[in-house]
Amino acid sequence: MAWTPLWLTLLTLCIGSVVSSELTQDPAVSVALGQTVRITCQGDSLRSYYASWYQQKPGQAPVLVIYGKNNRPSGIPDRFSGSSSGNTASLTITGAQAEDEADYYCNSRDSS
């Protein structure tokens, strides 16, 4: 039986930050099941504020997956991680799973 990779589409969209400056994200990306994907978000506000990352599946409310420097809410798998440098924040999914197929949004939040 031949192995067929499952392709996941991780979509990113732009939203405004809490400080009313624009953030821009990657276009849609695809990743094979089990591989690592990184989604980036850029904006001047990210020099002063951390990014929050949200996952949204069709017909469902957004779910916070990363906030602050690199914090995960309870129940979020450790394959999700966040990082930042300068005006760029990144969400990394290490070993993507089928259930990770979703839209991912970034937003900036206060660094305190």
UniProtKB/Swiss-Prot annotation:
Outline the extent of the Ig-like domain.
Answer: 21-112
Q: Where is this region: Complementarity-determining-3?
A: 107-112
Q: Where is this region: Framework-3?
A: 71-106
- Give one GO molecular function term: antigen binding
The set of disulfide-linked cysteines is 41-106
Residue spans of biased composition, Polar residues class? 81-95
Transmembrane segments annotated in the record for this chain = none
Residue span of region Disordered:
75-95
Signal sequence residues: 1-20
Map out region (Framework-1) in residue numbers. 20-41
Does the record carry Signal as a key word? yes
Any one Pfam family match given in the protein's UniProt record, by short name: V-set
Q: What does this protein do?
A: V region of the variable domain of immunoglobulin light chains that participates in the antigen recognition. Immunoglobulins, also known as antibodies, are membrane-bound or secreted glycoproteins produced by B lymphocytes. In the recognition phase of humoral immunity, the membrane-bound immunoglobulins serve as receptors which, upon binding of a specific antigen, trigger the clonal expansion and differentiation of B lymphocytes into immunoglobulins-secreting plasma cells.
Subunit field text: Immunoglobulins are composed of two identical heavy chains and two identical light chains; disulfide-linked.
Protein name (database record):
Immunoglobulin lambda variable 3-19
Its gene? IGLV3-19
